[in-house]
Amino acid sequence: MTIVCENIKKFRKFRGLSQAELGEKIGRSKNVVSNWERGENEPDLDAIAAACKVLGVTPNQMFGWERHPEYDAFYKRMFVYEQKMKELEEKRKAIDSELASIRKMLSDQ
């Protein structure tokens, strides 16, 4: 699978489009988009240009030669949120454990 195929999938998901929606906007079928994303076929230059336009990226970004700042910022925020969620889950487990201890203590009285 080429970087273009990976990036089509990455940017499509980032924009919240289904394969069918992207395909419709660029004049290709859902199956064609699916085949690209799985690396079974490569998009031609016209399809790449159309996908860039719909997905709001430059050809340099699609080919991986340049980073996409909006995408990078989004995933940095997602990473921070995931870390915070893990911390909250650990705190929740500690609270659950403490509550279980209190319940046991109260029931033993």
Enumerate the predicted regions with their spans:
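Short amphipathic helical patch at the helix-1/turn junction of helix-turn-helix
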Residues: 2, 13-14, 42
